[in-house]
Amino acid sequence: MSTSFENKATNRGVVTFTISQDKIKPALDQAFNKVKKDLTAPGFRKGHMPRTVFNQKFGEEALYEEALNSILPAAYEEAVAELELDVVTQPKVDVKSMEKGKDWEITAEVVTKPEVKLGDYKNLEVSVEESKEVTDAEVDEKIERERNNLAELVLKEDAAVEGDTVVIDFVGSVDGVEFDGGKGDNFSLELGSGQFIPGFEDQLVGKKAGETVKVNVTFPEDYQSADLAGKDATFVTTIHEVKAKEVPELDDELAKDIDEEVETLDELKAKYRKELEATKETAYNDAVEAAAIDLAVANAEIVELPEEMIHDEVQRAMQEFMGNMQRQGISSEMYFQLTGTTEEDLRKQYEADADKRVKTNLVIEAVAKAEGFEATDEEIEKEISDLATEYKMEAEQVRSLLSPDMLKHDIAMKKAVNVITDSAKVK
């Protein structure tokens, strides 16, 4: 095989390579055996046409396309490897010559991975807003949330205050005309919860059961229903019941009701503190990692990012997201319907930071290469086991979905992230 590469622009060029006769002849034989199954000729049964008869009738050239399709992928990969090119997109292939008895000449327009010139990526000084410290107030707040979850609603005769729950009927209208979705019966509404549009709940504070109130509000300009956005509306609202939230005493009995594994309130506080410390430790480490990687990327120099890489990253991110949705039993159609968004909205969301994600991956890959990181067999097996556990799959299923090269790449990337993060110093 002869190969050459002609640079056309930054990160773009043309690979020229030949496919030799020792590869072409077996491919032609294979192509003939495939197509002859459906061919007939006078004096021969279907599928038994001799090669000489085929060549006389159709010409050997009729097999070229089928033969090329079978050998082109491997030939292209061999050429790229020989030229030591790091290609990032599918090539645009063109056949230059396919003459009988001669080597075939092929060209492929390719986009190559940008060159990354690493700056400092070790011992970086970073600052993060997250704190690992857990305060008494945070522990108390967590217990208070659980305490409120155990609260009971008790009927009251007094006027409603914020935090009370009212049971109401309501009928909404704009300019005296009722609108779809503006009516409800025996609806339970916690005042101050923000369930309804701004101003609605405030006008029920101070009211008692049995009262009927005209609640005047204005729909937000960005309201989901365009027909109502920005318009004034009146809701005739009848209050049937007012209920106060009665929370249990903050004592050892409450602690046992919240968590059967503890006996006292102090034990519950200690357990919650430990849980919060673990959560904040993770958040802190994630913040340090993000800050360190961002700085390593900022310190690096990347020569012109190809648009194709950004496009591919958007596609990858969208497919990954929708795949996660499907694993939760939510189809793409259902997701867009539930969120009131479109595929184009999702695309724009991922396009917003695709450039950053691609640059980040390139820098991490460059660090892995600079450090000479590789994956051992033991590390590959552990990665497969971890993925199988995470996605509730059999190890063999993971092996069938991920190639060894992909696993090795992911492990090397993790090592690179660790070398950036572990050496970082927080200001």
Swiss-Prot record:
Reaction catalysed by this enzyme: [protein]-peptidylproline (omega=180) = [protein]-peptidylproline (omega=0)
GO MF term set = peptidyl-prolyl cis-trans isomerase activity; protein folding chaperone; ribosome binding
Q: Where is the PPIase FKBP-type domain?
A: 163-248
Give a short account of what the protein does: Involved in protein export. Acts as a chaperone by maintaining the newly synthesized protein in an open conformation. Functions as a peptidyl-prolyl cis-trans isomerase.
Instruction: Return the protein name.
Output: Trigger factor
- Record bears the keyword Metal-binding: no
For this UniProt record, the keywords arranged alphabetically read as follows: Cell cycle, Cell division, Chaperone, Cytoplasm, Isomerase, Rotamase
Q: NCBIfam families, alphabetically?
A: tig
Q: What is the lineage of its organism?
A: Bacteria, Bacillati, Bacillota, Bacilli, Lactobacillales
Gene Ontology CC entries for this record: cytoplasm
Return the EC number. 5.2.1.8
Domain of life from the UniProt record? Bacteria
Example GO BP: protein unfolding
Please name the Pfam families in this protein's record: FKBP_C, Trigger_C, Trigger_N
Biological source species: Streptococcus mutans serotype c (strain ATCC 700610 / UA159)
Q: Any domain commentary?
A: Consists of 3 domains; the N-terminus binds the ribosome, the middle domain has PPIase activity, while the C-terminus has intrinsic chaperone activity on its own.
